[in-house]
Amino acid sequence: MKTRLALLSLLLSGAVPVWAQAPFFQDKTISVILGGPPAGSADLRTRAVINVLRKHIPGNPTILIQHMGGGGGRQAANHVYKVAKPDGLTIGSMGAALVTNAILGEPGVQYDIDKLIYLGTPDSAQHYLFITHGDAGLTSLEKLRAASNVRIAAQSVGHPIYITGRVFAYLLGLKEAKFVVGFTGPEIDVALAQREADARVSTGDSLIRRNRDWLDKGLVDVHASIEIPKGERHPRFAQVPELASFAKSDRERKMIEMFRAFRIAGQNFFLPPGVPRERTQILADAMRKTLGDPEFLKEYQKLSGEAASPLAAEALEKVIKELPRDANVVELFNKLGGADPLPGR
């Protein structure tokens, strides 16, 4: 009787009991601010996530993408951090540059990566390979390290593949390596085949997908790899030396750790500081369910051409917090990302 009277009193007062309240996100629209252009790889990865994320958020809100590609994604990150209301209705999506730009002190960064709220990433693992064309005659690591003026093809100064090539060349101790830039990704393969370049960096999966015959016919030599995360070897290249084994100092080892952490950060999904804890938890839980959803895994493979390698919110936050930030390591990484000759060791 008392329970009935209490319920009647509640209804007459106009208050809505907690169990009867609609989910916060019901009939709402979430804007995903993407630091990249339409139809690019970041766009495809982001779409693979949001196509499934909606069903895991109570209330099934509408989710729309807004592209902000200016400043290599910095405009998007700055907007989420400084402009967006911290109400859970704005989510940022940006590649590893979100973390890289902040740690390396790039101009135009107006956000603090330690204050952003991370939801997770669908893209945390990668296996980079340093390969040379068979016609270059660099059939062993010893011959590669003894050679001078090895021509390494890449897209542009500062591009992730360019920086990765410089990291390989530096730690392998290549003599006066020459970086030939100005290619698209597919054009690098053509440049290698037509002997306009001797070497390139590729991911293991991309090499198998695009140029399996190069491997099957022994047309290229694979000299070293970078495992991301550490210890996770690509089954096809398990016997290839890992680049960290060539580090000579603690500074160089930390530089490799920094490189790994930058890549593990992958396609970050994040919130501005100050989003209420309850809404943050709802979105983090929804992202966790999405990243483990078979529908998402299939969608990601279809759109990106690669298998997803998800990392949930807590693990992603841990990677970023533990990232080496020593000034001398940052200085070395910045030199490797630039256009000047490789620094001495």
What are these regions (language model features)?
Residues 6-17:
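Bacterial N-terminal signal peptides
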Residues 20-118, 161, 171-214, 291-310, ...:
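N-terminal (or domain-start) structured segment
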Residues 28-38, 143-161, 197-198, 221, ...:
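Short loop->beta-strand "edge-of-pocket" segments that line small-molecule binding or catalytic clefts
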Residues 37-39, 96, 133-138, 155-160, ...:
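Short coil/turn segments
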Residues 89-92, 109-129, 151-153, 221, ...:
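A structural signal for short loop-to-beta-strand junctions that line the ligand-binding cleft
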Residues 103, 120-146, 223-238, 245, ...:
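Hydrophobic/proline-rich hinge and linker segments of small-molecule sensing/allosteric domains
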Residues 122-134, 151-169:
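Extracytoplasmic ligand-binding site segments that recognize negatively charged/polar headgroups
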Residues 210-291, 339-345:
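C-terminal lobe and pocket-closing loops
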